[in-house]
């Protein structure tokens, strides 16, 4: 979706927003604060090189969710101390094809579980074959991209992953 033109992104975001509303699912837009505002998304997720969370909060208001990607204990603690950050992304845990970033490994995940009283999502290279290690370290939320969209059956893969969390 990052390579699509803005009009197409807005159109798709509106369609996704409606699907989410109908199904009671929170809709977070990645990177694009303007699109999140246009489609009345529930929030926006930003990276370390994107707009600062304080500036995002000024734009989207107090009732929207702000997520921030973090890649180190220092970034995690800074996000934890910022009242404008509602949750963080912790990762990439493992090597991933969706980002050109050095994996942080399970150590940062363990740190987040023990030291950051802030909701977080473990992300990066998480697959069905390694998700048990993520769960064992205490992660309660995960983000998987290629494992799901590349699956022969997205619904079967999602169900399989959900079962691992329900054990």
Model regions: which residues?
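Glycine/Thr-rich beta-alpha phosphate-binding loop at enzyme active sites
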Residues: 39-41, 46, 65-114
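Glycine-rich phosphate-binding active-site loops on the catalytic face of alpha/beta enzymes
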Residues: 48-58, 89-100, 128-164
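Short, catalytically relevant binding-site loops at active-site mouths
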Residues: 5, 34-35, 51, 73-75, ...
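Glycine-rich, small/polar surface segments that engage phosphate groups of diverse ligands
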Residues: 26, 31-37, 41-57, 63-67
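Small/polar loops that bind or transfer phosphate-bearing groups
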Residues: 1, 48, 68, 122-123, ...
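Glycine-rich, proline-tolerant flexible connector loops at the mouths of alpha/beta enzymes
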Residues: 1-9, 92-99
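Catalytic cores of alpha/beta
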Residues: 27-42, 71-84, 115-121, 126-144, ...
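Alpha-helix-loop-beta-strand connector modules within alpha/beta enzyme cores
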Residues: 10-28, 56-71, 101-128, 161-167
């Amino acid at each position: 979706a990052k390579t699509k033109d803005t009009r197409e992104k807005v159109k798709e975001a509106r369609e996704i927003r409606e699907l989410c509303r109908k199904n009671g699912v929170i809709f977070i837009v990645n990177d694009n604060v303007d699109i999140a505002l246009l489609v009345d998304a529930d929030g926006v997720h930003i990276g370390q090189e994107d707009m600062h969370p304080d500036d995002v909060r000024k734009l989207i208001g107090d009732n929207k969710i702000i997520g921030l990607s973090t890649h180190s204990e220092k970034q995690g603690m800074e996000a934890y101390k910022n009242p404008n950050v509602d949750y963080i992304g912790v990762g990439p845990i493992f090597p991933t094809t969706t980002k050109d970033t050095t994996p942080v490994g399970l150590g940062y995940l363990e740190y987040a579980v023990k030291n950051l009283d802030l909701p977080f999502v473990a992300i990066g290279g998480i697959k069905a074959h390694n998700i048990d290690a993520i769960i064992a370290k205490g992660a309660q939320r995960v983000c998987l991209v290629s494992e799901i969209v590349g699956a022969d059956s997205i619904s079967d893969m999602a169900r399989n992953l959900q079962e691992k969390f329900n054990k």
